[in-house]
């Protein structure tokens, strides 16, 4: 089997931080809900999403997806110590039925 063409999923550790620097806005529609679901499975209820400062396209996409997700209680731009307007902090619901 050719290792370079392997379609095996890549496993990675879920943490309270998601760095989106390598993603395009069009890739976030599946990524963000999946990430939130995995965080809830790990009992992570406060997350930091790093979208960068740039022109704001990633930030706007992230905020739009957070607004639509019923598992998100609230969110805000991070304070300076956590990335300022280059990151967003979100609080997730503790309810397991959602």
Where do the PLM segments sit?
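Long, charged, low-complexity intrinsically disordered regions
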Residues: 1-98
């Amino acid at each position: 089997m050719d290792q370079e063409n392997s379609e095996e999923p890549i496993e990675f550790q879920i943490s309270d931080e998601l760095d989106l620097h390598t993603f395009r806005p069009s890739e976030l529609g599946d990524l963000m809900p999946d990430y939130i679901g995995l965080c809830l499975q790990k009992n992570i209820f406060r997350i930091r999403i790093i979208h960068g400062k740039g022109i704001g396209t990633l930030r706007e996409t992230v905020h739009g997806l957070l607004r639509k997700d019923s598992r998100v209680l609230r969110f805000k731009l991070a304070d300076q110590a956590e990335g300022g307007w280059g990151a967003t902090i979100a609080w997730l619901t503790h309810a397991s039925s959602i």
